[in-house]
């Protein structure tokens, strides 16, 4: 379809990848803002406590941006690696479920067996979740979450770079 036509145009494919990345990055940030808004405004309407944003607002935005970059990079890598949408959707769904389970999204890492606790240290979901927990619950600073921020940015850089390389090797022109 349209991707084939875009590939046939001579020139760099970078704007295509950058455009996709920018769009989905913004979608992630919009989702984050909507979830925060639900916690602040909707939860009290249901008789629940209002979400309190502890920590530094700049650190929360930085963490959300880094999580969005990591998630977008991962999605982009899956999209360019697999040949069909069905393959990408299947792998993406299963891998996200596995990464979230390992990363402590379903079950807190501290109740996992030691081997899984060690494995969870390699999950981007764990890095993001740990950073948000530290910011919201422990009023952490940017300095204290910096190791996870660097990991998330590194993951984003690796996945986006791999996406560009794979995309270039599959370019028709």
Label each region the model flagged.
Residues 77, 81, 139, 151-173:
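Junction motif at the cytosolic side of a transmembrane helix
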Residues 1, 33, 37, 73, ...:
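Transmembrane alpha-helix boundary/anchor motif
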Residues 91-95, 120-121:
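Central hydrophobic cores of alpha-helical transmembrane segments
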Residues 40, 44, 79-80, 84, ...:
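Transmembrane helix-loop junction
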Residues 13, 17-90, 97, 146-149, ...:
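Alpha-helical transmembrane segments and their short interhelical loops
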Residues 38, 98-104, 125:
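Aromatic-anchored segments of alpha-helical transmembrane domains
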Residues 1-11, 172-173:
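Transmembrane helix boundary and interhelical loop/hinge segments in multi-pass membrane proteins
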Residues 50, 104-158:
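Membrane-interfacial helix-loop-helix junctions in multi-pass membrane proteins
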